[in-house]
Amino acid sequence: PDCFVDSWSMHLTGKNNFRYEIATTVPYKGNRVDKPKPKHLAFLRDYLVKEWGASISEGQEADDTIAIEATKLGDNCVIVSLDKDLDQIVGWHYNFVKHLGYYIKPEEALVKLYTQMLTGDAADNIKGLFRVGPVKAAKILGDTTDELELYNKVLEAYEGNAERVLENAQLLFLRRYEGQIWTPPQT
């Protein structure tokens, strides 16, 4: 079916990011230090800001500003991105390479975050548990969709290392409102 867009926004990550201060186990995005930036990145960013009205996120990543905006708009928003991290946000999503639209339910978003807490995120140098990929993470979490139960299963998998669970969760969690930092669920 045809779809119409009333408005849209584009977000780019700025230079500062609170996650660099949270990461103590290994440097956040430390695996990218020696990798050169694409040759025309600065020109492209400038063009997107000037010609397309892209906004630059300062102090947080573009993923956070997208998540905040999507949370405010609810089902009146479609997140268009290839970034799997955004699948922890409830709502409509669209993968423009696969031409695939899908809806993430609240319980799916929650499980996505806790799965990442187990697997880590190699792209951002967030170390998960050794030899735990999506399949093993799914076995650890089972059919659980209750956040406290998910947290307890992750904590058990980390052999009670609450500090490491907290660090990974705070690195992986995308903000739903400005300044938000993930905290463990309360009993």
Language model: regions and residue ranges:
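Non-catalytic, usually N-terminal nucleic-acid engagement modules in DNA/RNA processing proteins
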Residues: P1-I22
